[in-house]
Structure formats: C-alpha cells, structure tokens
C-alpha cells in the first residue's frame, strides 16, 4: 500500500513487507499517541521488529498483541514496548468462536453475526508529527491505487476502512476530495447510503458543537473545503469515515442492483421492477427513494439516459423522470392492438428448406438447414446451438437471471430486401399490445410440445423476464427436468423452478406460426405462466402504455372570472432573453401546446413570459400576469383558509388522500378573455416576428385561479358529501382527504369520488395517493390515529449571533408550527423584539441573555410539538393566559395526551391595554375558532386572573367589555394558587400559574371629590408644561420647559408627572385635567392594564409608582368656558402659566403705527387732552395734510348697510409706477373696500366689486362716475346678474360724489403717511394697514362707533305708512332734507324714533329718516319749565 501513493514532504513510514496495510495502520495510530511524539528511529526499530515477528511461527492472524509483547526482547532499542502497550490497552482481548469469520477476511461485509469477533475500534485519524500544513489533491494514479487495494473488500469492512483511513492520513483531503473518492470507489447505491448517514452525523455534530465551526460562514462541508481550515477539515474526515460504519448490512452486490432496462422496455415498467425489488431486498430502515432514483438513471438504457441528460433530470424526483421519459420518447409505435401482414399469394418456386411449393420459406415448419458442419462436433445435420455437446452437462451451467434484460439487437429495424426478380418486400407492421393502468398484460395462448396437442392457458407478458416460465402440469410426463437456480425479484431460488431442455411451441392469437423455444423454465408450484423476452422477440412484439393526450376537460366554464367589465387588455412588451433561456422557453411552450393548454392567437393584448431554473436543473414556465391582475376584480373566496386537521374525529380512523395533477389547467377559459392572457414567443436575435399564443385554460399566476378551481371542485364533490353523511371530505385547493368510520365505507367513498372526478375529467396522481393503516401526510402535517404532528420542525441553534435573514426565516417556520408548540407568547415576543429597529436586511443581530434563554425554551418545546385529534363525545375546554407580552390560549379536551391547539395573540398596538378587554377578546376569538373548526363552543374558560380583580373590574369599569364578561361569566374558572384540572398533566408549562402584578389595581378612583385632599391642576403643550397644587390656596406652581421634539400629549404627561411628584406626601388627591386622553388613561390604569409600545412608554411607566396605593378623584374640565367658578379659574390660571404675556399697545405707539384719529386713541385708554396732544406731536401728521381739513360733501346716503355704495377709481404713484385703486364705500356706515390694480378696465372693476362683496356683503345699488370701465358691457352684465342697480354721478361734485371723493383723500393720506414712515413698505401692506385704520380703529364722533361696528349693527326696522310708532321721550332737532342743496336749517321738530346713524323726523305730513350729519339738537320752542337747553351743539359732519 505504501508504494501506491505519492510521497508527501514528510512521508508516512511504509509498511514492512508481508504485513497487511490495515494492521500497519494500527501500529502507526498507536505510535502517534506517544508523548513525546515518535522519531524516525522509533519507526525504524518498529519495522525491524515486525519483520522478525512475521517470520516467527507464533505470528497470529488476527494479531494477538499480548502474545506479540512477549516476543519483544528485553532492552530492545526504541519505544516498541510503549507502542504495543497502547495497542493492548485500546484492544480488549476476545476469543473468536468457531462460527466467527476470520477477522482479516475482507469479503464479509458488516454487520457480522452476533458472536463474531469485532475488530478493535480505530481512534480518530491522527496526522504525523511535522506533517505539512497543506493538503494534497488526488491524482488519478492515487485513486487507481486505492481502488486496487479495496477492490476485493466490501465497503465498511475492516480492510476497506483501514485502507481508506491510511489514504486520508497521507493526503489530508478536503470535503470535495472525499466526495470524489467516494464516487470513484463505491457504487451509486453505497454513495447514496453513505450520503444519508453523513448528513445525519453532520447534523448531530453541528448541534453538539464543533471546534472551529462558524454557523454564519456556511455549512460544514463548505468550510471543510478550505485548505487553511486544518482542524475543521480533520473533524469532517472523522465524520466521513464514521459514516461507513453506520451503513446497513449486505450492501455489496445486491440482487436488485443489477436490474437493467431492456432496449425496448418502457421506462415505467423498468422502474416498477426496481421498486418491487427494493421493497423485497432492501434492509429495514434504509431510505428507498434516493436509491431508487439513482438506479433509475444509472441502470436505464442509453435512450432514456440521453433523454434525461438532455432534459437536465438526472437527479430529479422520480415522478418527473417518469413523465419526461413517457412524454419525450420517440412516437414510432403504431397504436394498434394486433395487425397481420398483408396476405400475398405464395410463390410457385419450391421452399429451399423442405423443397415443397405452396408456402413461403419464412412460414416453413422445417428448420433451416445449417450452412455447414457444426464447429463443435463437425456434424452437418444441426446448428451449433443444437449441438448435443452444449446440452450434455447442465449441472455446471451458470444460474439463470429472470430479471436481467435482453442483449438482443433492435428487432424493429426495417428489413432492406433486394428489389428484383419480381419479388416485393412485404409490408410488415409489428404487433403492438397497448396497455392501460387498469389492464394487466395477459394473453390467451396455446402451448404444445412435440407429439402433443396444444393446451390453452392464460399467460402473463413480462418484458423483464429473460426466459419463458410454464406451469408443471403442462409439461409432458417423460420430460427430463434439470435443477437450476433462478435469481428473481424475491431473491435466488433453487427449488421452485426447473429447466426443461426440449423445444416448446407457443401459439399466439395474433400470429399464424407458433413461437418455438429451445428451452423454458417449469414452475413446480403451478403458480406462474410467463411469456418472457425470448418469446416476444421472436414474434417481434412489444408492450407499451398507450398515451392519453391531455385535453381541455369537461369542467364547467366559469361564469365570472373578474374581467367581465372588459377593460382594455394590457400591452406589456416582451423583454429580451439570452439563448439559453430562449431555448428553454421554446421547449416549455411546445409542451404546453402539445398539452392543448395554449393555442396560436392573433389579437390584442400581451404579457411577458420568461423561464426560471429550479434547483434540480429543470425550467419552469412563468407568465407575468401582474398587469392583468391589476385589471381584475377580486372574487370572494369560498374557502376560509386551510382546515385545522385536529378537527378530524378519532372515530373516523380510515383515511385516504387524493391529489389532483395540474389542477388549475382544468378550467376552460372563455374566448372573450383570451386577450388578457396572450403572450409572444420571440425569435432568436429578432430574426423574425414572434409567435403569438394565448391560454385556453386559466393559467397559474392569475389571482382568481385558486378561487375558481375551489368553486368547481366544491360543486363536483357536493353530491358525494350528501351521499355519505357519516364520512368527511376535506378539500383545500387540489388536495382532498377522505375519512370514514369503516373500511368498506371508505372504499365506496373513494370509488364515488374517483368516478366523480374522472367523469369531470380531472386527472389524479396515483403516486401521491396515501391510505391507512399508517400515517397520512396532508397539507404539511402528519395524521396519526390519535394525534397530528408537522412533517418538519425548525431546527433551532442556541447562539447569540444571528443574521437578520436567519432570524426572520426561523421565526417564520416557528409561526407555521406554533399551533402545536407548548410555549407561552412571552418567549416568542422576546425574539420578535430582536427584529425591531433594523433597516438594513444585511444586519447582524446579537441576542440578549433573555432572548437566548427564550431560544432554549422554544427548542425544548419543539420536542413536545404534538396535537390531539378531536373526540366528538367530549366537550372542549379553554385556557387563557394573559401576559404583558401577549395572550396565549389553549383548546383541549379531558383525558387526552395533547391539547387541540395553541393560539398566540399579540396585544393591540395601543399605549395601554386593559386586561378586561383582552380577556373579552380572547373569549370571542376562542368561541369563534372552536365553532368554526370543531362545530361547538367552549364549555368553560380557565384563566389566570384572580376573582377579586375580576369582580372589581366588573363593578367599576365602564368599558364595553364588561357586557361580554358578564354574558360569559358562568363559564369562568379561576386557576387559583394551586389549580386542579386536566392541564396539570396535559400542559407542561409551569409559567401559566405565575401571578401577574400588573393585573392588580395600582390605585383606587373615588367616585366623589375627596374633601381633605389637595387639588392638582396640570396642563401641557409642545414647549411647556405647568401645574398648580392648591389646598385653600396655591401651595405650589411651576412651569417646566420641554424638549423641542416633544408632542402635546407628552407635554400633558410631563405636567401631570411633575404635579404627582410634588404631591407624594398626600395619600389622596383630586386631579383636575382638561385632557380627555389623560382622564381615560388614568381610569384604565386604575382597573389594571398592560403597557403597550408607544413613544411615551417611559412616561406612562413612571405613573405607576407615583400613584401606587393612592385614592384619587379624577375630573375633566372644559377649557376656555370663561366661567367664574373656582375649577374654571384655576384651570385658566394653569393655562396662563404657559402663555407668554402680551403687552397691550399704548395710545402713543398705536398712533405711531396707524396714525388713527383722537377718538380712536380715547377708545384705547387716552383722555381727550392726551389724544389731542399725541396727534399734535406726530411729525408725520404735521407734514401731511390732516384729515380734518378735507372738504365736506353732501350726498344721498343709504338708510341701512349695503343699500347704496359709491365707487370710484383713484390713482397713486408708487416707486415710478402708476397704480389704480378701485374704492368702494358704503354710504350708510362709511366702511371701505379697496383693490389695487395696474389697469382700469371692465374686468378689473368686476374683480374689485367681487372682492368688496366677499368682505362687506352684496349691495342693493351702486353709484359710480360715468367712466368707460363702469359703462362697459361686461360690468353692466355682471351687475344685472347679481340684481344690483347701477347709477352714475357727476365726478368731483361734492353733492354727487362727495363721500367717495372724501374717502379717496383719507385713504391716500394714510398711505402717504405710512410710506413716509417706511419708504420700503409694500403697497399692498400699506393699503391693508389703511383699511384697518379706517374701518376698525377710527371712531365716528357722532355715534362713538367704528365704521365696521356701524356696518355690523342691526339694520333699522321698516316703518308702516299708516301707523305711527310709539312716542318716546321728546327730542327736538333742526334738520336738512337729504339730497337738497338748501343750506338753511328747518325746524325744530320733535323726533319720533332714534336709531344708530339716523332719526325719524316728521316732514310735511310724512316721516323721513334723517342721518345724524343733517341733524342738530334744538330747543323746544315753548319750554314747559325753566330748564335751559343744552347750549352745546355739534356739527354732525362726518370726519375721518
């Protein structure tokens, strides 16, 4: 062995001549364990001693190390004594019984018989001291040398293991090198078994922990490929070697490993033979699927192997390999049962065999004469195959293999006959026998021997049998039967079959001439009549399964698919594809076209298509229907979701599953919707226009396809459900589960369902059908007689460093199995918290100690993941566990091993979660779940809330959940301190009995005000918070500044917390707040609640210790009511603490800003003399003409607001530009509206009038000059549309337009003053400031009101013509008639009524309202007393 390998830098010492390699490795492993390590001198002395020991007569095989130690001379140099002592210590002495095989016999594979001597266990591979740090890859000569050493030993035998160990020790291979070595040394069967065992060992090692292994760096196999990972690579080498010892026994040369596919044998028949052979010969516990999949490709004929290679399915699932071979094999066989050749008249020439005419030579019954003498016996009368010398000795003949394929050439090749002599080649059509899934290959044949009449019999056609088998009763009595050994699917047999060495004639129904066989097998038990390949090859017939082409099935066409509104079809361009993808896409489209799922199409609409490569190398057709889905209306799904399989009663023990293939491709698509499902197959390199197709059936990817299929399938199964009321049919998508109380009823139900599905044309997958007894796999779960488990459970590695993707994926798997995992929500919540706060998907998460402990808890709980099936006679009980992190609810039944379901519900995303509301929600959820899945509500609810807390909540809470809890209170059961019940043995979770402090009320709310307690008023805003503590007087008040990022709610919380901090000494407190949020928060806290995630979570948590144990009265105060009660005044005082004080304007400042009149200053706190002094001292008012010097005007005024307006346009120069000011003034109140424009047009006048109407209201009539803008057609039409009377006056006439002209002067004077104060003041600002001064500041001296107050006053009432108003206290006035130019005063007369702005004066037998400016007080002409009239008279001329 040492000569076969290349020498490393520090070569391993070679074995002495005559010593087996596996023995030498034992000495090397012992030498490497010396301390200190061995030297070259030690190895030299060891080799020298072993050379001498081998030649001694006491040398034993196997080696007895105790005897060997006695042969070592005393004072022998080196450390040979220590090496042999290590071997004696590691190898316990055993005596081999007589029945044990020799220990060095490499031909006996493991496991050995019970009493066989077991080879000493070799320690893990140790590399030599000073070995190089890098490994050496294999070379071909190295692999050949290793294979030559182990060629005569079975995998796993001692010699095999020692040889491989030495190779590993010399080359230090990586994981890839070990994989190459396994493929080179062992068969595909052994490699597959070794791979299964290695995966198991790696998983166990990763769980226990490996030195140097980093889970984040990839699998162990990937890390072991790194040549620098020397320690980790050696761990992998030991696992790889240990996998051989775990191989099942008898793995060398199994009988079923040599089963090959015949040249004409269908692939499905070949796979069926393999499957039967594996079922009969595979050791128990060995996985069958990988071996069957490996042999199905490696032992297939060349045609199927080439096909599977071209399709990329050499390692695909077995169903896909079968489908590929059945679909893509050449269709060169005619689907004809039996067809005879065309009859032609026999020739006139004599037959060259028998010399007689009247028949063809091929139909001659005489054997063809041999071409020459037999090469064995030189007899010219027979052929070589009929030579007696070949038949003389059959005892030493080789065993017959029944299941080996035929090696004959292709028998269906067309014969090329010479054309000449008037002879034509007969038209030969080969007989083919089509089979179906339900039909067995059986024919009625007749069997005869020489000098016997034919006997009819039913024969089974078997292309896997090499030789024909006949029953013994057909054999003539004088037959000479010979012993033989037959190797079949059940193993070798020496007694069941005999060989008959004489000709036998078999008459087939489709052949005139019989098939003549030189020999056949005789079944001594009269069980089998088989026509093998020897008979089928002579008649040139073959068996095949008739193809059943896929077609659009007779399923009902759906009436609604969501596109009935017929929107415009989408037009999404097809994107380019590389040649590989385009070729795969062309192949996929061809398959869909053959299956009649699509058809050529010419019309509008297009959606892109592309292929996706699966992990197994196959391609999948993807039609991007997102554009169509966006146009489609959602259909209401009849399915509420996947069923809970625990609802399957235990009294329905007999189960069967039915799986439908290509479910969505069975629903026909109406032609009107084809534009929405059209696509284009592009040409390579755009060499031509693409080919257009559209779906004939609803495709995958359409969002309503699952809903439509469920509706169709439910309609098909509805009659079956009515016919079998005692059975259950569970349907979800294309998976169907049947459950019945009796096997006979299940059989009838299965037949009924199968017939219904077959009638509608829905194909079923027979490979995936499962039935009891045994477990049933359905919807990812395993159904056992009394429980439900999941097919796969997530493997959790307890570690502190996780990537975000790993943790998210693991939690997703946990969510799938959470209904059966006995763990509380708190453990899951800890892991959910670890996902928060990350924005980069590539982040790495470091778990806290609490989260790592949660991982351990979940890992233990997964080992108990199991759920019980429903017992219909027992009630359903519920357990509710409330925790701050969420609610855990359990549904279970008494006397059962496992619960029905675990439900984990997170708390709602609110700042405070009252436990009473959570309990009510859990009750509603459990009742709904139980009623939906089990058909009954819960009998009782067990919860972890004390009776005292529940009673207090029901008596004091005003929440809506109180009504729900009272309704279900008769079903409540408190767990108590020491609970008793079925869950003590059922639920292995001790945390459910822990008390929750949060559920206890932290403080008590008093229903009335507490007399002896102080009062706390608090408030807050985004920048400040304040509180006042009052007890007969203000004890303390404080204003708190807040951070800039604070919200209003946080400000209110800050104020309340500061007030509570100051009120700590008092056991009771009255709290008055104007925040409904805080009032509700305190009331919920008093009842007991869980804190939720919020931005103010820390502030909410600080409330609990400050209120703990207090008695509190809470009162809500409405703010800004201006009431004078103490509560409102103290609340306003709290608000005032947060407001910055606003200093009122003094009269001097007000005049400096606005230049208002003295009456306005008196209205703002100045006396008459002070106001006059302020105006006189103003420099701006001195420079610019004061308002008092403007000329007076006399016009016709309105008697009420918005009766008569005057309008005018005045011009103003501002910064070298000329502006037009369109002024409107009400003649009753004098209120003004101004619009600044650049032009004076009809449109500008309309805009200005609209602006005035929006502020002052709509006038009854307007009065303007006769300018072109006011007389324009546009302005006149606008006034007519609003029913406004328009009249004109004489411009610049005091008696016609005096009011508006005076207003223009006042306005321009104020603007000039403002611009004098600030030259850069914008014109719009100056105009607005002027309007504020004129309308809202300046006070009219006649009525002591502003123009705006006068304009908003109540209008004067209308006076009836015939009735006089009631007389008031007499007042005498001199008056002038409005509108007249007479300067003389009339009167005095007594006023009948006075109002704001005018007085009612009798004039000439009628009554007129005279404005105050045309009135002056007079003295009664005949006073009744000596009272002197008021000598003060005032001119009521309006001033600005």
UniProtKB/Swiss-Prot annotation:
**Binding of Mg(2+) 2, residues:** 1019, 1052, 1074, 1135
Q: Where is the composition biased (Pro residues)?
A: 98-113
In its UniProt entry, what is this protein called? Gag-Pro-Pol polyprotein
Domain Peptidase A2 span(s) in chain numbering: 457-535
Q: Which organism is it from?
A: Human T-cell leukemia virus 3 (strain Pyl43) (HTLV-3)
Q: Can you quote the record's cofactor note?
A: Binds 2 magnesium ions for reverse transcriptase polymerase activity. Binds 2 magnesium ions for ribonuclease H (RNase H) activity.
Q: Which domain of life is it from?
A: Viruses
- Gene Ontology BP annotations: DNA integration; DNA recombination; establishment of integrated proviral latency; proteolysis; symbiont entry into host cell; symbiont-mediated suppression of host gene expression; viral genome integration into host DNA; viral translational frameshifting
InterPro entries membership:
Aspartic_peptidase_AS, D_retro_matrix, DNA/RNA_pol_sf, Gag_p24_C, Integrase_C_retrovir, Integrase_cat-core, Integrase_Zn-bd_dom_N, Peptidase_A2_cat
Every copy of the Reverse transcriptase domain together lies at 593-783
CC annotations in GO: viral nucleocapsid
Annotated segments matching region Disordered: 93-117
Keyword tags: Aspartyl protease, Capsid protein, DNA integration, DNA recombination, DNA-binding, Endonuclease, Eukaryotic host gene expression shutoff by virus, Eukaryotic host translation shutoff by virus, Host gene expression shutoff by virus, Host-virus interaction, Hydrolase, Lipoprotein, Magnesium, Metal-binding, Multifunctional enzyme, Myristate, Nuclease, Nucleotidyltransferase, Protease, Repeat, RNA-directed DNA polymerase, Transferase, Viral genome integration, Viral nucleoprotein, Virion, Virus entry into host cell, Zinc, Zinc-finger
Necessary cofactors: Mg(2+)
Further comment found in the protein's record: The reverse transcriptase is an error-prone enzyme that lacks a proof-reading function. High mutations rate is a direct consequence of this characteristic. RT also displays frequent template switching leading to high recombination rate. Recombination mostly occurs between homologous regions of the two copackaged RNA genomes. If these two RNA molecules derive from different viral strains, reverse transcription will give rise to highly recombinated proviral DNAs.
Residues covered by the Integrase catalytic domain: 1197-1366
For binding Mg(2+) 3, which residues are annotated in this chain's numbering? 1208, 1265
Function text = Matrix protein p19 targets Gag, Gag-Pro and Gag-Pro-Pol polyproteins to the plasma membrane via a multipartite membrane binding signal, that includes its myristoylated N-terminus. Also mediates nuclear localization of the preintegration complex.
User: Which PROSITE patterns does the entry link to?
Assistant: ASP_PROT_RETROV, ASP_PROTEASE, INTEGRASE, INTEGRASE_DBD, RNASE_H_1, RT_POL, ZF_CCHC
């Amino acid at each position: 062995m040492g000569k076969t390998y290349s020498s490393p830098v520090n070569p391993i010492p070679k074995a002495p001549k005559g010593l087996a390699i596996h023995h030498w490795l034992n000495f090397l492993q012992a030498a490497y364990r010396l301390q200190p390590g061995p030297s070259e001198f030690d190895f030299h002395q060891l080799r020298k001693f072993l050379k001498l020991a081998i030649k001694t007569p006491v040398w034993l095989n196997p080696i007895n190390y105790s005897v060997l130690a006695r042969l070592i001379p005393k004072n022998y140099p080196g450390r040979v004594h220590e090496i042999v002592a290590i071997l004696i210590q590691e190898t316990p002495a055993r005596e081999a019984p007589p029945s044990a095989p020799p220990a060095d016999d490499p031909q006996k594979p493991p496991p050995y018989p019970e009493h066989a001597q077991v080879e000493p266990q070799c320690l893990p591979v140790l590399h030599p001291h000073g070995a190089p740090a890098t490994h050496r890859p294999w070379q071909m000569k190295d692999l050949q040398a290793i294979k030559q050493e182990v060629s005569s030993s079975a995998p796993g035998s001692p010699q095999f293991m020692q040889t491989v160990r030495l190779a590993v020790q010399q080359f230090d291979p990586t994981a890839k090198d070990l994989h190459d070595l396994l493929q080179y040394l062992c068969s595909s069967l052994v490699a597959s078994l070794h791979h299964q065992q290695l995966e198991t060992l790696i998983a166990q090692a990763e769980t226990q922990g490996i030195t140097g292994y980093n889970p984040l760096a990839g699998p162990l196999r990937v890390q072991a490929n790194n040549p620098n990972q020397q320690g980790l690579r050696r761990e992998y080498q030991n696992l790889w070697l240990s996998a051989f010892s775990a191989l099942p026994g008898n793995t060398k040369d199994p009988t079923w490993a040599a089963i090959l596919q015949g040249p004409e044998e269908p692939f499905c028949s070949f796979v069926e033979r393999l499957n039967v052979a594996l079922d009969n010969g595979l050791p128990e516990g060995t996985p069958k699927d990988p071996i069957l999949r490996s042999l199905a490709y490696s032992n297939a004929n060349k045609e199927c192997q080439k096909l599977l290679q071209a399709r990329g399915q050499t390692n695909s699932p077995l169903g896909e390999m079968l489908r590929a071979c059945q679909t893509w094999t050449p269709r060169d066989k005619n689907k004809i049962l039996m067809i005879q050749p065309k009859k032609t008249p026999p020739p006139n020439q004599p037959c060259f065999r028998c010399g007689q005419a009247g028949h063809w030579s091929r139909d001659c019954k005489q054997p063809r004469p041999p071409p020459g003498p037999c090469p064995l016996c030189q007899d010219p009368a027979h052929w070589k195959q009929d030579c007696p010398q070949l038949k003389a000795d059959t005892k030493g003949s080789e065993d017959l293999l029944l299941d080996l394929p035929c090696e004959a050439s292709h028998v269906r090749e067309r014969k090329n006959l010479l054309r000449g002599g008037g002879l034509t080649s007969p038209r030969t059509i080969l007989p083919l026998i089509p089979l179906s899934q339900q039909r067995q290959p059986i024919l009625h044949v007749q069997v005869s021997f020489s000098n016997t009449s034919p006997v009819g019999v039913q024969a089974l056609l078997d292309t896997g049998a090499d030789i024909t088998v006949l029953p013994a009763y057909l054999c003539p009595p004088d037959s000479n039967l010979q012993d033989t050994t037959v190797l079949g699917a059940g193993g070798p047999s020496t007694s069941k079959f005999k060989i008959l060495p004489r000709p036998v004639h078999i008459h087939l129904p489709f052949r005139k001439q019989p098939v003549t066989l030189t020999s056949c097998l005789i079944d001594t038990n009269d069980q089998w009549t088989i026509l093998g390949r020897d008979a089928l090859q002579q008649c040139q017939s073959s068996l095949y399964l008739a193809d059943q082409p896929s077609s659009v099935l007779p399923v009902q066409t759906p009436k609604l698919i969501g596109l009935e509104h017929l929107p415009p079809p989408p037009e999404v361009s097809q994107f380019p594809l590389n040649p590989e993808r385009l070729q795969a896409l062309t192949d996929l489209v061809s398959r869909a076209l053959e299956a009649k799922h699509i058809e050529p199409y010419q019309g509008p609409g297009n959606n892109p298509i592309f292929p996706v490569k699966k992990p197994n190398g196959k391609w999948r057709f993807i039609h991007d229907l997102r554009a169509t889905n966006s146009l489609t209306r959602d259909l209401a799904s009849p399915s509420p979701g996947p069923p809970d399989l625990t609802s399957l009663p235990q009294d329905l023990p007999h189960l069967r599953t039915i799986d439908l293939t290509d479910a969505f491709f069975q629903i026909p698509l109406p032609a009107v919707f084809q534009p929405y499902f059209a696509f284009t197959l592009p040409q390579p390199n755009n060499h031509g226009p693409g080919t257009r197709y559209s779906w004939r059936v609803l495709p995958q990817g359409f969002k309503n396809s699952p809903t439509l299929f469920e509706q169709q399938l439910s309609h098909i199964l509805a009659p079956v459900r009515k016919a079998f009321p005692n059975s259950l049919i569970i349907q979800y998508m294309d998976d169907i589960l049947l459950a019945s109380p009796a096997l006979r009823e299940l059989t009838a139900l299965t037949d009924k369902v199968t017939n219904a599905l077959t009638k509608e044309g829905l194909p079923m997958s027979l490979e995936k059908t499962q039935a009891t007894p045994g477990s049933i796999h359905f919807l990812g779960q395993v159904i056992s007689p009394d429980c439900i488990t999941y097919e796969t459970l997530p493997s959790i590695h307890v570690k502190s460093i996780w990537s975000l993707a790993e943790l998210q994926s693991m939690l997703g798997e946990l969510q799938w199995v959470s209904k059966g995992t006995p763990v509380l929500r708190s453990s899951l919540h800890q892991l959910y918290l670890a996902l928060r706060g990350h924005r980069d998907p590539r982040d790495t998460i470091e778990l806290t100690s609490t989260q790592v402990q949660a991982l351990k808890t979940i890992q233990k709980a997964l080992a108990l993941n199991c759920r019980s099936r429903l017992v219909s006679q027992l009630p359903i009980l519920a357990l509710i566990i409330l925790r701050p992190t969420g609610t855990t609810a359990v549904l279970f039944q008494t006397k059962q091993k496992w619960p029905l379901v675990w439900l984990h519900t997170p708390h709602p995303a609110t700042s405070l979660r009252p436990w009473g509301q959570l309990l009510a929600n859990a009750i509603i959820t459990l009742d709904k779940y139980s009623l939906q899945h089990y058909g009954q509500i819960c009998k009782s609810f067990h919860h972890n809330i004390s009776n005292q807390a529940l009673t207090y909540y029901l008596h004091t809470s005003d929440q809506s959940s109180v009504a729900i809890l009272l309704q279900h209170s008769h079903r409540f059961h408190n767990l108590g301190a020491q609970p008793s019940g079925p869950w003590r043995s059922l639920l292995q979770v001790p945390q459910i009995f822990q008390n929750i402090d949060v559920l206890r009320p932290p403080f008590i709310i008093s229903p009335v005000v507490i007399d002896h307690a102080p009062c706390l008023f608090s408030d807050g805003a985004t920048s400040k918070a304040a509180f006042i503590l009052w007890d007969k007087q203000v004890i303390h008040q404080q204003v708190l500044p807040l951070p800039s990022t604070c919200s209003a709610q946080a400000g209110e919380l800050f104020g309340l917390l500061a007030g509570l901090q100051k009120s700590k000494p008092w056991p009771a407190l009255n709290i008055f707040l104007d925040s409904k949020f805080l009032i509700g928060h305190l009331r919920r806290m008093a009842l007991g609640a869980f804190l939720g995630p919020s931005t103010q979570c820390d502030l909410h948590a600080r409330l609990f210790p400050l209120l703990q144990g207090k008695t509190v009265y809470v009162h809500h105060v409405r703010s800004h009511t201006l009431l004078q009660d103490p509560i409102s005044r103290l609340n306003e005082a709290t608000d005032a603490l947060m407001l910055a004080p606003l200093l009122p304007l003094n009269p001097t400042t007000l005049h400096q800003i606005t230049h208002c009149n003295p009456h306005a200053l008196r209205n703002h706190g100045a006396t008459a003399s002070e106001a006059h002094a302020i105006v006189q001292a103003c420099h701006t008012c001195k420079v610019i003409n004061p308002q008092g010097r403007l000329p007076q005007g006399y016009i016709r005024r309105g008697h009420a607001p918005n009766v008569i307006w005057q309008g005018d346009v005045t011009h103003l120069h501002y910064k070298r530009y000329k502006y037009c000011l369109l002024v409107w003034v009400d003649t009753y109140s004098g209120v003004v509206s101004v619009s600044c424009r650049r032009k004076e047009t009809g449109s500008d006048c309309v805009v200005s009038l609209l602006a005035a109407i929006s502020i002052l209201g709509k006038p009854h009539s307007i009065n303007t000059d006769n300018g072109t803008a006011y007389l324009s057609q546009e302005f006149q039409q606008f006034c007519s549309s609003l029913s406004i009377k328009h009249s004109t006056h004489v411009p610049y006439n005091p008696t016609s337009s005096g009011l508006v002209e005076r207003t223009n002067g006042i306005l321009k004077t104020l603007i000039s003053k403002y611009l004098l104060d600030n030259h850069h003041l914008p014109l719009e600002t100056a105009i607005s400031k002027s309007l504020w001064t004129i309308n809202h500041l300046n006070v009219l001296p006649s009525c002591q009101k502003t123009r705006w107050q006068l304009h908003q006053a109540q209008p004067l009432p209308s006076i009836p013509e015939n009735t006089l108003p009631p007389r008031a206290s007499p007042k005498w006035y001199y008056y002038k008639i409005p509108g007249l130019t007479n300067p003389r005063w009339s009167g005095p007369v007594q006023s009948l009524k006075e109002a704001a702005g005018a007085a009612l004066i009798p004039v000439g037998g009628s009554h007129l309202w005279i404005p105050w400016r045309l009135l002056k007080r007079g003295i009664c002409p005949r006073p009744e007393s000596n009272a002197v009239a008021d000598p003060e008279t005032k001119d009521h001329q309006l001033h600005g």
